[in-house]
Swiss-Prot record:
Keywords: ATP-binding, Cell junction, Cell membrane, Host-virus interaction, Membrane, Nucleotide-binding, Nucleus, Phosphoprotein, Repeat, Tight junction, Ubl conjugation. It is found in: Cell membrane; Cell junction, Tight junction; Nucleus. The gene is MAGI3. Its main location: membrane. Ubiquitinated following interaction with HPV E6 protein, leading to its degradation by the proteasome. Degradation is independent of E6AP ubiquitin ligase complex. InterPro entries: GK/Ca_channel_bsu, Guanylate_kin-like_dom, Guanylate_kinase_CS, P-loop_NTPase, PDZ, PDZ_sf, WW_dom, WW_dom_sf. This is Membrane-associated guanylate kinase, WW and PDZ domain-containing protein 3. MAGI3 PDZ domains are used to design peptide ligands that bind and inhibit PDZ domains.
Length: 1481
């Protein structure tokens, strides 16, 4: 049964029972009894007697009643409706102790008997039965009166008191009548009984007790005395505490209440219930004097909280208000009496649309009373009365094969890949046959030749399916493997139902559509262009349907076809609605069929999976993929690809003109305008050919739950981009299979924690970790403590089941965990169609492809990103789309490319079947000009929230600190997001406005202080499944370190790195829905472990920079922005110099000048002696500038695998920590000119002091390996080249030991990383090419001078980099290797090959010592392109090992460095550091 308004407790739940006795004379009840029918009141308790002499009431068991409580029963005997005297007589009749049943007076039951009798309830409900009991008791002492004349056999004063109208009105005005009303023009009433009975009346006690024992068989004859009377004072009950109203007929027009013991007119009608103002007439309800047959097998009768009866069909797991036993006794509509409705019909009193009628059996609505309609047709000689009349085959339905009428046909069919080749219809109710609708051409059934349309399916492989549901039979066919045979028994002789204009049809296919649940295959698929004025449209059953004219649709002359489908009943004009669906164990819970405007929802089979979907909705998009041009089977395949539990948004068209096979029935008999199809292909909708009021009058809102949900959203404070989901779970032995988190404070929400493997929640598939728990069995949990929530779950466990309402965040465009298709996210960049479009979208004509020619400059890329679907798309769908267009790029300037456009060819070569890597390579090979063949995507306007569109969200598209938009388009980052036309490490993915943020601490990622709303901007979720060794990532930070939580490392081949969306340096904002702000490191681990095999992380993209413990001040974001504090806006020249590796950057032979120069303009003043041609593809560049890291760190390589990306990220991570220590390397890395703009440059003033520059700090010294090589070789680009091998041991130590903030642990890890780094560094030097460079080795004297001029820097604050002091003993041999790590590598590769082996051996030893000393400045001459290739090979080796390889080191005595804030170096120290480079000019 669908969810209705949340109900409060019925008065029945407040009934109290107790056993009382009294100390006194027998029969002297110890409590005062007040009220009574003679006063028009229920009997109720007065004060309890406490006289010591006798009559004192004593409660034996139960809770003592309170004075004023209404007395309902005494020892099980109802006393409501009895006089006070008779009530006391019943009490005295029993021995003490006696059992009393009482209830506190409320809004429904109070002392006023007249009030309760004036209310109208559903027949069979608790209240309706109580009303009948009251009347039974009343008629013991009173006789109803009427103004009509006596009928034959009626005795005045026995059956009725026959009085005049004047006498009746006098009684009514005097208040002597408990009930009054009219029926058939006559007045009826029930007078109050006299307080004292006449001497001729028998004692009522015997009658009360006797009738109570034989209640089911011996109904007293006046129980329905006023059952047909139209009450003058009828009203709806007001439940206690504003309960939902359980009574119905709020209009008060219940033709209900006459009474006569022998008149059948009195025994048939009952007003029925509705949650609104409606009446469902159960006029065929079995009366109490009739013996009811048992319910059908697996049916159950139950009561709602308000006492209303409903029926549960366990066969189909559905509920209904209709008694299945009454179906066989249902009358034809024309045989019903006035005021009576046929079985299954309901009367709706709607304040907006007036009165209309609902046929629940056929899901139809109409304004005309079906009984009046049927009688009118009968008078006109029309035999056919539409769906209200039972179909012929329904009247002959049987579950017994022996009672079938017709010829039995047996067939054996072999299942092909396309199924069995026939469609089925029927099975919507247990009393309906399943019949063959069509036999598909060339299918197994057609080849067998034995099956024909109309055949009733009797038996499948020996299992009788008569009475089975549609879904059950489809599932049986699905379970048959391909190439296996199935034996069918069919019965020929039953025609197909006449009312099959739009039936539920299922193709019995090999992979039948969504769930085994009635996915339909229509016979005709018409394009709207085919509809021409005057053309005749044939319905599926071959009958002539509607003639299309220039003005619109003319309905058929047959009035029986004039119905309003419930699908269009809720809207007055066409609207596009996005509905989130969840795929259940058996599918999405609905069936589809072809229609002229697309695939239409044929039937709702299981509404819990497709809440909000309605019959008749036209499907436009599935998961943001346009399916209007797809065939029925293609749409089926699209739906089938989603796994169980997947969230699938569906864009549907609802409302507006009905489909061409139906028209709306209006209250008038005027011609019905169902709309024009002239504007179908117009981009702008034409005016509606009918006023909205006509549609409203013909389309009443039928679904009370839908009205409730719509109204609920008006008042409910529901966060945007969330959806609420109801999950019903049955308890297993191990429980419900999930854990609960949160509830630690009054403002803390409750979340779903771990989903237990193989538990009930996991098997159900809908519940997820991090879902916010809203309600448990209808009880809100917001604000409740953790213990209270557990108590609620304990209560639910006792019941064996629980209904959970959870709220889930919707991340538009984000990858759903269950779906590994990135295709689903492609069109989300443009969003989904807006909701206010009023046209009737039709299948658009295929878009014509067009060519777009892009030209780029040498220093830029083409400026677009291609996304490729991982899963094989449906036929005809191009899997490659434009995922992003970079602002200001060639793609943006041309104006012809839009996000979502499909790319079918590159330079005339089709790419439809090519992989993503091949496409990227193809575009890169095109040089500076590329021609794209584009098929424009249909216009999209974003989801309702408007936050889903990349074009609508420039803030997300261009984020500061080089954060890539790729975070919002998750998928295979390495495969999907490489920049087209640029090399791996130089992809130009950001506009100039991105880089200007680098000098603004406010926009840095490090700024995490603020509201949670601000914190979550730009974040994206990642759900990981635990691998054999965990989730594959490690954390840094926590409250105890006074910093946030960051991704520290990614394990090789772990789930995190395979996912491709997590990167080193990303900040963790939430773990399984719980915010991480202010939580400890230990708590973060606990949250991850609590998620079981899955964890849901909300990440904010980082820059690859991981702050050190102590550098991070969560209360002061600027304090963590040490890197940026001294920066000035980056000049464009330096920007391009550091960003674009493919450009030729002029550099000084002494490359320190490039890194230490104050302004980028100074580069122009220095004449370059040598230039270095930079290789574009250098993923091994580990020590490239921080600017490049910040800007393009998030851009994964387009042609390299994860290893390159991981290695790069790890290096950046290390450089980040170096940057925290602020060495000259760091400013160079980050825009060296920028940072050093505020630092006195010793380069020009005191070149002799240059060696001091290298001794600023251990970290700086390590960085200097890159720094110095930059000067000596090709400037910053040279440094970038050498990054692959120049990751310092210091940096590696930080990466390896980042979890431990202690210095001792840092030292241990440092030593280990040093040994590893030294070993790998020596190997990296053995470049097979053997080519050498000149001017690699400087004089030993110069090297010694460098060593001696080194000074220790007290400026560094890194705690873990405390080094040992070593004697500074330098030989010529070692001096030649006192250059930085990169220099050492270069020396080996370009230096003296004769001594290479010796050098390598020494390098291993020196690299171990190097961390304890400051590296010497290295001088490297210009490198050739061949040597760059060698470096690339060496870097590849580094990537394989994931280690950073120091090249050389020299033992230099160093002092301990104490942590502290970074200070700008004084002039003398800096100049001393820089002097050597000047000297070498």
């Amino acid at each position: 049964m669908s969810k209705t308004l949340k109900k409060k407790k019925h008065w029945l739940s407040k009934v109290q029972e107790c056993a009382v006795s009294w100390a006194g004379p027998p029969g002297d009840f110890g409590a005062e009894i007040r009220g009574g029918a003679e006063r028009g009141e229920f009997p109720y308790l007065g004060r309890l007697r406490e006289e010591p002499g006798g009559g004192t009431c004593c409660v034996v068991s139960g809770k003592a009643p309170s004075p004023g409580d209404v007395l309902l029963e005494v020892n099980g005997t109802p006393v409501s409706g009895l006089t006070n005297r008779d009530t006391l007589a019943v009490i005295r009749h029993f021995r003490e102790p006696i059992r009393l049943k009482t209830v506190k007076p409320g809004k429904v039951i109070n002392k006023d008997l007249r009030h309760y009798l004036s209310l109208q309830f559903q027949k069979g409900s608790i209240d309706h039965k109580l009303q009948q009991v009251i009347r039974d008791n009343l008629y013991l002492r009173t006789i109803p009166c009427t103004t009509r004349a006596p009928r034959d056999g009626e005795v005045p004063g026995v059956d009725y008191n026959f009085i005049s109208v004047e006498q009746f009105k006098a009684l009514e005005e005097s208040g002597a009548l408990l009930e009054s009303g009219t029926y058939d023009g006559n007045f009826y009433g029930t007078p109050k009984p006299p307080a004292e009975p006449s001497p001729f009346q028998p004692d009522p006690v015997d009658q009360v007790l006797f009738d109570n024992e034989f209640d089911a068989e011996s109904q007293r004859k006046r129980t329905t005395s006023v059952s047909k009377m139209e009450r003058m004072d009828s009203s709806l009950p007001e439940e206690e505490e504003d309960e939902d109203k359980e009574a119905i007929n709020g209009s008060g027009n219940a033709e209900n209440r006459e009474r006569h013991s022998e008149s059948s007119d009195w025994m048939k009608t009952v007003p029925s219930y509705n949650q609104t103002n409606s009446s469902m007439d159960f006029r065929n309800y079995m009366m109490r004097d009739e013996t009811l047959e048992p319910l059908p097998k697996n049916w159950e009768m139950a009561y709602t909280d308000t006492g209303m009866i409903y029926f549960i069909d366990h066969n189909t797991k559905t509920t209904t208000w209709l008694d299945p036993r009454l179906c066989k006794k249902a009358k034809a509509p024309e045989d019903c009496e006035d005021g009576e409705l046929p079985y299954g019909w309901e009367k709706i009193e709607d304040p907006q649309y007036g009165t209309y009628y609902v046929d629940h059996l056929n899901q139809k609505t109409q304004f005309e009373n079906p009984v009046e309609e049927a009688k009118r047709k009968k008078q006109l000689g029309q035999v056919e009365i539409g769906s209200s009349k039972p179909d012929m085959e329904k009247s002959h339905f049987t579950r017994d094969p022996s009672q079938l009428k017709g010829v039995l046909v047996r067939a054996s069919l072999k299942k092909s890949t396309m199924g069995f080749g026939f469609t089925i219809i029927g099975g919507d109710r247990p009393d309906e046959f399943l019949q063959v609708k069509n036999v598909l051409k060339d299918g197994p059934a057609a080849q067998d030749g034995k099956i024909a349309p109309g055949d009733v399916i009797v038996d499948i492989n020996g299992n009788c399916v008569l009475g089975h549901t549609h879904a059950d039979v489809v599932q049986m066919f699905q379970l048959v493997p391909v190439n296996q045979y199935v034996n069918l028994t069919l019965c020929r002789g039953y025609p197909l139902p006449d009312d099959s204009e739009d039936p539920v049809v299922d193709i019995v296919a090999a992979t039948p559509v969504i769930n085994g649940q009635s996915l339909t295959k229509g016979e005709t698929c018409m394009n709207p262009q085919d509809f021409k004025p005057g053309a005749m449209v044939l319905e599926q059953n071959g009958k002539s349907g509607h003639t299309l004219t220039g003005d619109g649709l003319n309905g058929p002359s047959d009035a029986s076809e004039q119905r309003v489908s419930m699908a269009s009943s809720g809207s007055s004009q066409p609207e596009l609605v996005t509905i989130p669906l969840i795929k259940g164990p058996k599918g999405f819970g609905f069936a589809i069929a072809d229609s002229p405007t697309g695939q239409k929802v044929k039937m709702i089979l299981d509404s819990q999976w497709c809440q909000g979907l309605q019959k008749g909705d036209i499907i436009k998009e599935i998961y943001h993929q346009n399916v209007q041009n797809l065939t029925h089977l293609q749409v089926v395949e699209v739906l089938k690809q989603f796994p169980v539990g997947a969230d699938v948004p569906l864009l549907i068209l609802r409302g507006g003109p009905p489909s061409p096979t139906k028209t709306a029935k209006m209250k008038t008999d005027k011609k019905e305008n169902a709309g024009s199809l002239e504007a179908i292909n117009e981009p702008i909708p034409q005016p509606m050919p009918f006023p909205p009021s006509i549609i409203r009058s013909g389309s009443p809102k039928l679904d009370p739950s839908e009205v409730y949900l719509k109204s609920k959203t008006l008042y409910e404070d529901k966060p945007p981009n969330t959806k609420d989901l109801d999950v019903f779970l049955r308890k297993q032995e191990s429980g419900f299979g999930f854990r609960v988190l949160g509830g630690d404070g009054p403002d803390q929400s409750i979340y779903i924690g771990a989903i237990i493997p193989l538990g009930a929640a996991e098997k159900d598939g809908r519940l997820r970790a991090a879902d916010e728990l809203m309600c448990i069995d209808g009880i809100p949990v917001k604000g409740k403590s953790h213990k209270q929530v557990l108590d609620l779950m304990t209560t639910a466990a006792r019941n064996g089941h629980v209904l959970l309402t959870v709220r889930r965040k919707i991340f538009y465009g984000e990858k759903q965990p269950e779906d590994d298709s990135s295709q689903a996210f492609i069109s989300t960049q443009n969003g989904s169609p807006r909701l206010n479009r009023a046209e009737v979208p039709a299948r658009p004509a295929p878009q014509e492809p067009y060519d777009v020619v892009l030209q780029r400059k040498e220093n830029e890329g083409f400026g677009f990103v291609i996304l490729t679907s991982k899963n094989k798309p449906p036929p005809g769908v191009i899997p490659h789309k434009i995922g992003r267009v970079i602002e200001g790029s060639p793609a943006d300037r041309c104006g012809k490319l839009k996000v979502g456009d499909h790319i079918s060819a590159v330079n005339g070569q089709s790419i439809v079947e090519l992989s993503h890597d091949n496409i990227v390579q193809l575009i890169k090979d095109a040089g500076v000009t590329v021609t794209l063949t584009v098929i424009a995507e249909e216009e999209h306007h974003g989801p309702p929230s408007g936050t889903n569109s990349a074009r609508q969200s420039p803030a997300l598209q261009h984020r500061p600190m080089g954060q890539s938009q790729a975070n919002h388009i998750p998928g295979d980052r390495s495969a999907l997001e490489g920049e087209i036309g640029k090399d791996v490490s130089t992809s130009y993915r950001h506009s100039w406005s991105d880089h200007k943020h680098l000098a603004q601490p406010d926009t840095a990622v490090i700024s995490v202080v603020g509201s949670r709303h601000n914190q979550n901007l730009g974040c994206y979720p990642v759900e990981l499944e635990r691998g054999p060794r965990g989730f594959g990532f490690s954390l840094r930070g926590g409250k105890e370190y006074n910093m946030g939580l960051f991704i520290l490392r990614l394990a090789e081949d772990g789930p995190a790195i395979k996912d491709g969306r997590i990167h080193v340096g990303d900040q963790i904002v939430e773990i399984n829905g719980e915010p991480t702000q202010g939580i400890t490191h230990t708590r973060a681990i606990e949250l991850i472990q609590a998620g079981g095999n899955k964890v849901l992380l909300l990440l904010r993209p980082g820059t690859g920079l991981i702050p050190d413990h102590g550098d991070w001040d969560i209360n002061n974001p600027s304090s963590s922005n040490v890197i940026y504090d001294e920066q000035s806006p980056l000049p464009p020249s330096s920007h391009f110099a550091s960003i674009f590796e493919e450009s030729h950057v002029p550099v000084i032979e002494e490359s320190l000048r490039v890194q230490i120069c104050e302004k980028a303009e100074e580069l122009k003043d220095i004449v370059p002696e040598k230039k270095s041609t930079l290789n574009e593809n250098q993923p091994e560049i580990k020590h490239q500038s921080l600017l490049q890291k910040n800007v393009s760190k998030r851009d994964p390589p387009s042609s390299h695998g994860h290893s390159n990306k991981k290695n790069l990220l790890k290096v950046e991570n290390g450089v980040t920590r170096r940057g925290r220590s602020v060495s000259p390397k760091k400013p160079a890395s980050q825009h060296s000119e920028e940072h050093l703009d505020k630092i006195p440059s010793p380069l020009k003033n005191n070149p002799k002091r240059r060696p001091r520059d290298q001794s600023l700090s251990p970290s700086k010294g390590e960085n200097k390996s890159c720094q110095v090589s930059t000067r000596a070789g090709s400037g910053q680009d040279q440094c970038r080249k050498s990054r692959g091998r120049s990751a310092s041991p210091k940096k590696q130590q930080k990466i390896e030991g980042s979890k431990a903030p202690s210095n001792a642990e840092a030292k241990l890890l440092e030593g280990k990383s040093r040994r590893i780094a030294g070993y790998t560094g020596s190997n990296a030097e053995q470049i097979p090419d053997g080519k050498e460079k000149s001017d690699v080795i400087r004089k030993d004297a110069k090297q010694n001078q460098l060593e001696k001029s080194r000074t220790r820097s007290p400026e560094k604050k890194i705690k873990r980099m405390v080094e040992k002091s070593l004697p500074s003993k330098m030989t010529n041999k070692t001096t030649s290797k006192e250059v930085s790590e990169n220099e050492k590598g270069k020396k080996v590769t370009t230096g003296e090959t004769s001594s290479s082996n010796d050098k390598i051996g020494e390098n291993v030893q020196l690299s171990e010592k190097r961390l304890k000393q400051e590296p010497e400045e290295k001088v490297v001459s210009n490198k050739t392109e061949d040597h760059k290739g060698k470096e690339l090979e060496a870097a590849d080796k580094n990537k394989e090992t994931g280690r950073f390889k120091p090249e050389s080191s020299s033992p230099v005595k160093k002092t301990l460095i104490t942590p502290g804030p970074w200070k700008v170096p004084s002039g003398n120290k800096v100049t001393g550091t820089i002097g050597m480079a000047e000297k070498r000019q």
